């Protein structure tokens, strides 16, 4: 009798312990899900109170936190919106692609125009008259031209160099033109030409004959 009673007590205690474990395991599962959700929501944000140390949820679940760290990086790698990001992924970018210094084309154009010398009409006429006499001038002649035109010796040299180049180009153009034009004698002999009477005879012979006048070709107007 005592044996059956003890067996009944053991069965009841086992059932009660199983029920207790079942009821206690359900809150543990819910708590695990809530902690997992809280930990996933914290990824990408930085809490000022816990910015220096990992969160307690991460310490409780090292396996899951390690997976998130491997996939997304630790939260301190992400800053708040509006804050600068971390160092660039390619630190060698400035060395590979330095800033290109574009030239100032305005200054280059101004400098090129600044170096060009302009001559007045009186100066050009004096230099041109001297060039018609001789395309090369000596030092003494350049000194005379300098006193007449108020130009420097270098400016006079440059003008004569440019003038000789211009004359050379003009001569080359004339030579090219004469090579392509047919050469005809200026005064052909009389045997090659025709007199005025012969030319008129030739024209009359090759013109079409004029139609004979027929007074009845057109109808007469009524009186």
UniProtKB/Swiss-Prot annotation:
Pfam families, sorted: Homeodomain
Cystine crosslinks: none
Biased composition annotated in UniProt, kind: Low complexity: 1-25
Keyword Nucleus in record: yes
Location, primary (coarse class): nucleus
Key word Transmembrane present: no
Top-level taxonomic group: Eukaryota
Signal peptide: none
Function: Involved in control of cell fate and pattern formation along the anterior-posterior axis, acting mainly in the tail. Required during embryonic and postembryonic development. Essential for the determination of specific neurons, including the PLM touch neurons. Plays a role in neural fate specification in the hermaphrodite-specific neuron (HSN)/PHB neuron lineage, acting in concert with T-box protein tbx-2 and the asymmetric cell division protein ham-1.
Designated name of the protein: Homeobox protein egl-5
Organism of this sequence: Caenorhabditis elegans
High-level lineage: Eukaryota, Metazoa, Ecdysozoa, Nematoda, Chromadorea
Gene name of the encoded protein: egl-5
């Amino acid at each position: 009798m005592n044996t059956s009673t003890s067996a009944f007590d053991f069965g009841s205690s086992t059932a009660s312990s199983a029920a207790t474990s079942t009821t206690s395991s359900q809150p543990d599962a819910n708590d695990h899900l809530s902690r997992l959700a809280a930990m996933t929501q914290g990824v990408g944000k930085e809490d000022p109170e816990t910015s220096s140390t990992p969160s307690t949820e991460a310490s409780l679940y090292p396996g899951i936190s390690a997976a998130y760290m491997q996939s997304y990086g630790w939260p301190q790698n992400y800053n708040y919106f509006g804050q600068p990001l971390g160092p660039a992924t390619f630190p060698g970018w400035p060395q590979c692609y330095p800033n290109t210094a574009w030239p100032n084309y305005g200054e280059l154009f101004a400098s090129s125009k600044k170096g060009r010398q302009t001559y007045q009409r009186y100066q050009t006429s004096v230099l041109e008259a001297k060039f018609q006499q001789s395309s090369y001038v000596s030092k003494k002649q350049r000194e005379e031209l300098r006193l007449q035109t108020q130009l420097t010796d270098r400016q006079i040299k440059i003008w004569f160099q440019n003038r000789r180049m211009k004359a050379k180009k003009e001569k080359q153009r004339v030579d090219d033109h004469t090579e392509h034009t047919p050469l005809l004698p200026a005064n052909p002999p009389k045997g090659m030409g025709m007199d005025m009477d012969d030319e008129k005879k030739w024209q009359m012979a090759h013109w079409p004959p004029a139609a004979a006048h027929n007074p009845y070709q057109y109808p007469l107007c009524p009186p």
